[in-house]
C-alpha cells in the first residue's frame, strides 16, 4: 500500500534547492509512494489541502460541473469566510445546490475551528533544515509537521542545523533529528530499503510543485567532497 509522503522546507530564502529532500523524493517514488513537496506559507498549504477535499466532495456529488476550475474561489471562501466569495463559487449553478452548500460550509468550519488538526492525512513527513539563524521558522515548520503526520514516529528532521544542534531541536520539539547522511541500506527509513539514499539521483520535478524560485534551480548538482578534511579537536 502506497504512503502519502510530505516533504517540507521552511519558508526561508535560500539560493540552492533542498538536495536532501530531492533524494528522498526519488527514494519514496521508487517505493511507489505519493510524494508532495511544499515550501511556503503553512496556512496556505492547509487551505489548499482542505480545498482539494472540498472539490473532491463536490465533484462526487455533482460531476456535471468542473469544480476544479472554481477551486480558487472555494479557497478564498474557506480562508476569508466572506459571502461574496461563496457567491463567486457558483453553487447555485448546480441542480442540487441545497445539498452542496452545507458541504462548503463544513470545509470552511473544518479549517477555522482547527478540526483538521485531529485528522492528519500524511503517513510520513520529512523536514529539512539549514542555518541556525533560521531557528524560529525551522521549529515552526517541525511543529507544523507534527500536526500533519498520523504518527510522529514517522517524522524525519534532517539537514545542516539538525546535524549541528540535534539536542536543542529535540528539546524544543520532542522530535529527535537524524544526524548526518542517509547511507545505510536496510535501516534508513525502511528496514526493507535496498538503497543508499544519499547516492540516489535528485528528483528535480518536485521544484515544479512550488511557487518559490531558487536562483540556481536550473543547475545540476554533484558532490566532490563531504564535510571538512581537517581533523580539528
Segments predicted by a language model, with ranges:
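Aromatic- and Gly/Pro-rich amphipathic surface segment
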Residues: 62-82, 87
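RNA-binding accessory domains that recognize and position tRNA/RNA substrates
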Residues: 30, 74, 137
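Extreme N-terminal starter segment of soluble prokaryotic enzymes
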Residues: 1-6
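N-terminal beta-loop-helix "entrance" segment that forms/cooperates
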Residues: 43-66
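Glycine-rich beta-alpha loop elements in corrinoid/cobalamin-binding modules
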Residues: 20, 24-27, 37-46, 82-218
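A short beta-strand-loop structural module common to alpha/beta enzyme folds
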Residues: 8-11, 31-50
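Detector for Asparagine
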Residues: 11-14, 66, 154, 193
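N-terminal pre-triad scaffold of radical SAM enzymes
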Residues: 7-18, 203-233
Amino acid at each position: 500500500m502506497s504512503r502519502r509522503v510530505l516533504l517540507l522546507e521552511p519558508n526561508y530564502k535560500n539560493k540552492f534547492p533542498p538536495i536532501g529532500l530531492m533524494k528522498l523524493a526519488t527514494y519514496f517514488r521508487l517505493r511507489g509512494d505519493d510524494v508532495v513537496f511544499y515550501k511556503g506559507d503553512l496556512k496556505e498549504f492547509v487551505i489548499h489541502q482542505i480545498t482539494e477535499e472540498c472539490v473532491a466532495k463536490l465533484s462526487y456529488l455533482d460531476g456535471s460541473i468542473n469544480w476544479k476550475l472554481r477551486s480558487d474561489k472555494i479557497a478564498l471562501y474557506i480562508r476569508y469566510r466572506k459571502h461574496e466569495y461563496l457567491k463567486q463559487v457558483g453553487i447555485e449553478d448546480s441542480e442540487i445546490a441545497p445539498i452542496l452548500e452545507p458541504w462548503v460550509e463544513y470545509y470552511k468550519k473544518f479549517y477555522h475551528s482547527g478540526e483538521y488538526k485531529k485528522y492528519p492525512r500524511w503517513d510520513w513527513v520529512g523536514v529539512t533544515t539549514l542555518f541556525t539563524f533560521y531557528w524560529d521558522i525551522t521549529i515552526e515548520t517541525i511543529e507544523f509537521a507534527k500536526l500533519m503526520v498520523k504518527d510522529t514516529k514517522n517524522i524525519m528532521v534532517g539537514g545542516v542545523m539538525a546535524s549541528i544542534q540535534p539536542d536543542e531541536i529535540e528539546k524544543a520539539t520532542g522530535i529527535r533529528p537524524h544526524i548526518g547522511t542517509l547511507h545505510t541500506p536496510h535501516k534508513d527509513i525502511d528496514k526493507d530499503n535496498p538503497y543508499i539514499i544519499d547516492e540516489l539521483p535528485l528528483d528535480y520535478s518536485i521544484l515544479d510543485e512550488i511557487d518559490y524560485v531558487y536562483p540556481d534551480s536550473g543547475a545540476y548538482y554533484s558532490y566532490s567532497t563531504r564535510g571538512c578534511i581537517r581533523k580539528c579537536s
